[in-house]
Amino acid sequence: MKNTNLPEETKEPISPGSSHRKQNKTGTKTCFPETTVLSGRDRLKRHREEVAGKVPIPDSWGKEGLLMGWMDFSTFDAAFTSSQIVSARAALMADSGDDAGARGSRPQRLRVESSC
């Protein structure tokens, strides 16, 4: 039974000692480029070298004000120093201090048991 789904050149049997690379009708080999696996750092370095001098980098991009506004942490700092958070922290510290007399002079330590 003849397989008609494959192209004519792939129907030829491959001998055990031959290369798996195909030869075209003229007898020259079609070479596949050797692929090397590059790390991300090597690919970035190669890309930087390839585009060096071809990509203009502006001195300013016109949106620096937005960047500075985004980096402003004053709204977050105000939320973290609110009186509610400070009073909650003080209440937790007071709760832990109330039981210290019942346990002795040493505070209770958290015990972590191995699950292995």
UniProtKB/Swiss-Prot annotation:
Disruption phenotype: No visible phenotype. Bic1 and bic2 double mutants have a blue light-hypersensitive short-hypocotyl phenotype and an increased anthocyanin accumulation when grown in continuous blue light.
CDD domains, A to Z: BIC1_CID
Region (Disordered): 1-33, 95-116
One GO cellular component term noted in the UniProt record for this chain: nucleus
Major subcellular site: nucleus
GO biological process, one term: blue light signaling pathway
Top-level taxon in the UniProt lineage: Eukaryota
Protein's UniProt name: Protein BIC2
